[in-house]
Amino acid sequence: MNTKNLTLQTYFPTLIGVITNPDHQTLENKLTKKCLKLRKKIKSGGENWISNETYNTLGTYHLSEDPDFSNINDFVTNQVIHYCKAQSIDLNCLDTDPLAWLSLYKKNNYQEWHAHTPAMISAAYYLRCNDSSAKIYFKNPVDTMLPPKVLSYNNLNFEQVEFQPKPGMLLIFKSHLYHCVAQQQNNDIRICLSYNYRRKD
């Protein structure tokens, strides 16, 4: 059997955009203090979350309306536009006024598997973290009922992928993609700013 001419053509890819904000260091300390103040005065959101001890402002405080976060908000939106352009997504259908909230992880906090539907594009920006902060995991959206035995994993057959957060790192993904956050093991705080971009009607 001649396999020399076999080519593997990639279709239906799962795209995760990754970039680091070059201006992050000028923003981290000020906005970390702001997030800690918000935790003291704003009720935690995330109704019906299993991980209900993880502080978040989903539905209780909108970061997209806070001018203190405007630099990061603008950075995220600009990168989401690049992400869409790379896939020839019609920008006229992208609502560039996102729903944005913060999640603050202390030791033993986590986030269960979830997706961000009915949003269209989602993003996670890491405001405060270190090299041992909890990782984020993404699950392969294709559920194979009878998976083959895999000898070694690569970007063609991963069942899930993980990212180690770094300060200023931004991840962009389609909102249907399931993801979770491992349990925070260290005593430092991990602050993630999350964004949901909806489709315009």
How would you label these PLM feature ranges?
Residues 17, 98-100, 121-123, 191-195:
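Hydrophobic residues positioned within well-ordered beta-strands of beta-sheet architectures
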Residues 12-14, 118-120, 188-190:
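A general secondary-structure signal for short beta-strands and their flanking turns/coil
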Residues 7, 112, 182-186:
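Short proline/glycine-enriched turn/loop segments at secondary-structure junctions
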Residues 1-90, 110:
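Non-heme Fe(II)/2-oxoglutarate
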Residues 152-201:
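Catalytic core of Fe(II)/2-oxoglutarate
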